[in-house]
Amino acid sequence: MDILKHHTIKRLYVIAFLVVMIACGSESNPESAINNLEPRAGVSSTQIDSIFQTLRYFPNQTQFSIAFIADSSVTFYGAIRTNDTLRTINNKSKAFEIGSLSKVFTATLLADLAVEDKLQLEQPIQAYLDLPLRDSLQITFKQLANHTSGLPRIPSGFIWESLLHMNNPYKDYDEDKLRNYMSHELELADESETAWQYSNIGAGILGYTLTKVDGRSYEEMLQQRIFDPLNMQHSTTQREWVEDRLVTGLNKRGNPTSYWDLGAIPGAGAIVSTAEDLAKFALANFDPNNEALRLQQQKTFTVNSDWDMALGWFIRKQNSDHVYWHSGGTGGLRTMLVLHPESKKGVVVLSNISSGHKHAGRISSLGFSLL
């Protein structure tokens, strides 16, 4: 082998090694994490230990913003990992992208319009659209809200398009593309009336259709129907409004990453919010006089023996116990909201670590364990 060829191959090996190292990133070591989390009134030592046992699996700069709701009181607890040390911080007013947890709020808008008799849950959405659905498909509001429409998780061809913006996959999914999909590409992944299939595009179409029903933008509907009445001052789909509060998202390697733009389907996951604001929403869900939230909590579909669907909510069943929940995940953040209406208890968990991190599922588990 000549010297030039040898050095060329050596360089290629070095480049390949560096690419692999960059892709893998540094692995956070749970055993190296130092626990400096402080006690707090209203949060048990067991709960604090659960927070430590979860956060220690994530890289430096990962933080949790947690709200404990009990009856009419709320206790906040913040934690961050820096220099392999876990410490307590005050981040209850910090804004996080909540991802698919936004679907709960889209369903709240649906329930609110239903209470006002502006639509019927069993009504096909076609009546409110100014374009035909492909093959004259009949899809109802309820089916979109409880994931029984038969629509796929993402629109056809989206995977290839998203490769152009891997850190912000929905960035270019504008209204023209959505309308073209609905009229010319829409097809059911499952046509069975008893099938359940989680659908991001279904939630996006629901949010889009609701704007046609109400004659207002998705953001305007959120502010006027939910956020303003509940005094959720730092919740929005317009990130620039809360830019000074935004927590930096981390990808699965622990490096800073961008928030997601949802284009024409904000109803699928565009909201940013705070633990403080989400606690207000949780409390509202315990109000027996809130007709829209009462309607939203009604069971609409039985998935299996372990869980049901309400409008936007998952319902976990354990004997006669029913826990309402929804999680959210993007390329840089992971969230969880858990409610137990019977005992008027709830938990909010916001984090700034990617849903693609191999331990991201521990954050959902933490939400249940803290309840």
Can you annotate each of these PLM segments?
Residues 70, 74, 125, 132, ...:
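Short, solvent-exposed turn/loop segments enriched in Gly/Ser/Thr/Pro and often Arg
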Residues 75-77, 132-140, 150-157, 229-239, ...:
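Secretory-pathway/luminal and periplasmic proteins that interact with or process carbohydrate-rich
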Residues 1-35:
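Bacterial Sec-dependent N-terminal signal peptides
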Residues 58, 82-199, 216, 251, ...:
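Active-site-proximal loop and beta-strand segments within enzyme catalytic domains
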Residues 79-81, 189-191, 235-241:
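Glycine- and aromatic-rich loop/turn segments at beta-sheet edges
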Residues 66, 71-73, 97-120, 124, ...:
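Alpha-helical scaffold elements that line and support the substrate/ligand-binding pocket
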Residues 24-79, 211-214, 220-224, 228, ...:
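Catalytic loop of the DD-peptidase/beta-lactamase superfamily, centered on the K-T-G motif
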